[in-house]
């Protein structure tokens, strides 16, 4: 459905009924010429200003899109490395799949999903232009270094509040308080639900792919591993620590696999530790993931363990058998056992906070 209109009504008038302005004829002719051409083109130069990250697929740089009249827009450029491909043909085929997914993600326009601007090539090397997300990814945010930075910049009263409502130290890394962790999880579920409705699986949900923006919102980023269920990639890649058991076993990665990955991230946020730290082999990871639901009371803090609703929600995300997980991301949020019910529980107990604003203030204190 088209939502953009081209208006050809009467010109703007002043209060006495006369035309508000008289545009020069030459300028009007240029305007009409632009419209009559029915196409536009211009040259764009993007400078690789700063490395934002690197991984198995390539590197991501901060850049700027420059326009006229001193307009600039920060953007992120992901440059896909061919190193993992045996031939140019394999690289081209893989990039074609990624481009198809990127085009569909660009049309979803969901607030908690990364916006994709373009997919281009330079000397046959593919580059994806994306929005630059100003904030912190969870992997970087949940470090003792940033927790200490926060402590050094706030008053004793504010520090006590942060520890009670937002974040506190955990066994191996900072842990988020349940209300904040669930607020982030709900926004991630909204992003996954939008993808899954389009039959797209993210395929790599992990802390470094979840950004907290300075607005206080969460956003799932890096769709380089995402794929359409009708066009499965071979071979598939994953981050073993956050991959669902069925993925480690070589079976299909499905929308429920994304839920398991998000569940592992949630447990890490709540526990202040990575539950699979130190495990190096697939066999060790598989065994640990099958045992994780039983081990939750041992690794989660008391304030979580004593909340039956929250414990059942965690188990509904990470169940080793995908058929025992929530049926989809929307259900994980909205069912009686879902994340929304826990937030309603906090509200009834007068324990809730304006979490979006709390995150925004916290990130401001880190700068």
Task: Identify the meaning behind each predicted range.
Residues 119:
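Activation-segment/catalytic-loop signature of the eukaryotic protein kinase fold
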Residues 343-367:
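Regulatory extensions appended to serine/threonine kinase catalytic cores
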Residues 123-137, 141:
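Conserved short submotifs of the Hanks-type protein kinase catalytic core
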